[in-house]
């Protein structure tokens, strides 16, 4: 049996996991947020995640450190990014190595950016092109994984990417507490959709309003999920996000 573990905020990683699962066949997908350290048995194990601040999301770092997997399982990683890939795959390989786990292959996929805190959505035309490229890359990855082929880490060839990644990633530890800057206006109807869709179960509903519990990943799922656009972050994100 093939297995894929994923972390997703606004859906890019979930799409990749679903698309790859379909191509591989005999594959199950699992949320990384629900992994508690149990041993994973499987023919192959895929780890799918977005790039945050030019590196790994904190939840992925935690997952890799506690990952317990059979010695004969072929392990690969897929990092998707909207801007630049940074050093996410290098980090992934290093953390797994410290944990005594070998990363056999890894891949980069450029997807429509979803970092609503920094920029708006790309045009529909650009998004369609990126999704078309993703579909082709999935076929390539599936063929690669089926024969358990080894490969070197896919890296960015942009100099500015390699320079910026160290500067920006040092701020990743601030993400957990950054949820203190979320606000909710009177348009909130208390539907609880933000809490249900939070990728790390960081939101609880209190008296009909969302309450953030300070282990946020800044994935923007809550903002994207709100049907009334009632959630804002630092008064900067109350706008349509078409992803």
Feature map (PLM): residue ranges:
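Generic structural motif recognizing short loop/turn segments at the entrances and edges of beta-strands
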Residues: 1, 25, 178-180, 208
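Residue-level signal for the start and early helices of compact helical domains
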Residues: 40-42, 173-175, 179, 207, ...
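A mid-sequence, solvent-exposed acidic-amphipathic segment
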Residues: 159-191, 196-199
């Amino acid at each position: 049996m093939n297995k894929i573990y994923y972390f997703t905020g606004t859906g890019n990683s979930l799409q990749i996991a679903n698309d790859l699962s379909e191509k591989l066949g005999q594959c199950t997908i699992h949320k990384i947020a629900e992994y508690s350290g149990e041993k994973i048995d499987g023919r192959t194990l895929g780890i799918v995640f977005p790039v945050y601040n030019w590196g790994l999301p904190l939840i992925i770092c935690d997952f890799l450190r506690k990952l317990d997997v059979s010695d004969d399982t072929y392990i690969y990683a897929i990092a998707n990014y909207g801007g630049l890939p940074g050093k996410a795959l290098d980090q992934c390989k290093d953390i797994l190595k410290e944990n005594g786990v070998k990363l056999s292959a890894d891949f980069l996929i450029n997807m429509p950016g979803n970092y609503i805190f920094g920029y708006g959505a790309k045009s529909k035309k650009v998004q369609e092109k990126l999704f078309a490229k993703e579909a082709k890359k999935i076929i390539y990855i599936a063929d690669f994984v089926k024969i358990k082929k080894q490969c070197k880490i896919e890296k960015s060839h942009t100099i500015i990417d390699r320079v910026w990644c160290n500067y920006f990633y040092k701020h990743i530890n601030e993400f957990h507490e950054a949820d203190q800057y979320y606000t909710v206006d009177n348009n909130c109807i208390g539907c609880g959709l933000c809490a249900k869709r939070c990728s790390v179960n960081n939101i609880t509903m209190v008296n009909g309003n969302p309450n953030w519990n300070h282990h946020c990943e800044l994935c923007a799922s809550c903002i994207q999920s709100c049907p009334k656009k009632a959630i804002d972050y630092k008064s900067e994100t109350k706008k349509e996000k078409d992803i």
